[in-house]
Amino acid sequence: MTMTAAPDDTALPWIAGPAHDIATKQRGHALLLQGHPGAGVFELALRVARTWLCETEGADAPCGRCTACHLLSSNSHPDFRALLPELTQAELGWSVGGSETVDAGDGEGKAKKKPSKEIKIEAVRDAISWTQKSSSRGRAKVLLLFPADAMNLVASNALLKTLEEPPQGVRLLLVAEDAERLLPTLRSRCQRILFAGPTPEQALAWLEGQGAANAPVLLAAAGGHPLSARRLAADGFDAAAWIALPKRIADGRWEPPAGATVPRLREVLQKLCHDAMAVAADATPRYFPAASLPPAAAWIKLSDWSQSLARLARHDEHPFNAPLITDSLLAEAKAVWAKPRGRAA
C-alpha cells in the first residue's frame, strides 16, 4: 500500500512529547488513541508508528535519516499500512493504492462514485492477511486505522481476533475522536490513550506561524483546533468573512465560498446554531464573536433548526443535488431570524 504524500508530523511541535511517551512507554500491541483530528491526533499516530519502525539503534523518535524513515516519508514502507476511508483520503489529499482506492468510474459515461465514509470489510480482511506475512525488513509491522470508528459492524468484528492475538511483531494503532463509538469488544482489547492536543498558546502560535491573519478569530471558529482552523482558511474563510457571516446569513445575503461542500456548509451552520442557542440562553458563544451574532432568535426555531442539521449530518455525503441542498439550508437558516408577518386586517 502506497500513498503519494505524507503529513509532516514534525511540523506540529506539541505532538513530539506525547509521541515519545507513547512509543517508548506503552508496551501493548494495540493502542487506541483518542483525540480530535483538528488537534493532530492522526499525525501523533503517524509519529508513533515512525518511531517504532525507525532503524536507528536506540532511537526514541524518528531519526529521519535511516532507510525506514525515508520509506515512511514517501509512504512506501512495506511494513506499514494505514486504512482510511475514501472520504478521509480525499480530505487529506492522499492517493492510496489497494482496497481503499477511490473509485473514479470504470469508463466514459459512468458516474463517479461518491467517496465512502467507511473503512470497508475488504480492506480490513486484506490488512489482516498482510499482518500474517513476515516483516519485509525484519522488524515490527504497524497497522493504523483512522478513524477507527469508520469501520462498520462487519469490519469491526473481523478485526477482533487480530486485536486479541496479533501475529508476532505486529502492532496496531486505532485512532478515533470518540472511542465510545467503537464496539466495546474493540475498546477492551486496546490500551486507551487520551490526546488533549496543544495548549491555546501553542495552537495560536502555530497558526500565526502558518501566516493566518487574525488567527484568534479563526482558532475560535475551529473550536480551538489549529489544523481545523487552517482548513477553514483553505476553504476560503478568512477572519473578516467569518465575523460577517452570522448577520449575512440572517439577512439572506451570504454566499458560501466557491467549492464549499454540503458537509462543510452544514458544519458552519451547526456552529452558528450552537452560538445562537448560547446567546438565547444568556451563555457565552464559542465559535463567533458575540458582537457578530444577530439578535437572539426564538428558542423553538433554534431547536428545530438544530435537529434539522443533525438529521442532515447522518447522510450529507450522499450524492444528492448539492446546489439545491445549499439553497435549502440557507433559506432555513434565514427563516430562524425572520420576523413573523402581521395579520391582515
What role is predicted for each listed range?
Residues 150-151, 165, 181:
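Residues immediately C-terminal
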Residues 162:
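Conserved P-loop NTPase nucleotide-binding/switch module
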Residues 153-156, 338:
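Short N-terminal helix/helix-N-cap motif within the alpha/beta-hydrolase-1
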Residues 137-142, 167-173:
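Loop/turn-to-beta-strand initiation segments
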Residues 81, 156, 183-187:
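A short local structural element in Rossmann-fold oxidoreductases
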Residues 2-154:
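Clamp-loader machinery-focused feature within the broader ASCE/P-loop NTPase space
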Residues 1-51, 57-60, 67-68, 132, ...:
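Charged, glycine-rich active-site and insertion segments that engage polyanionic ligands
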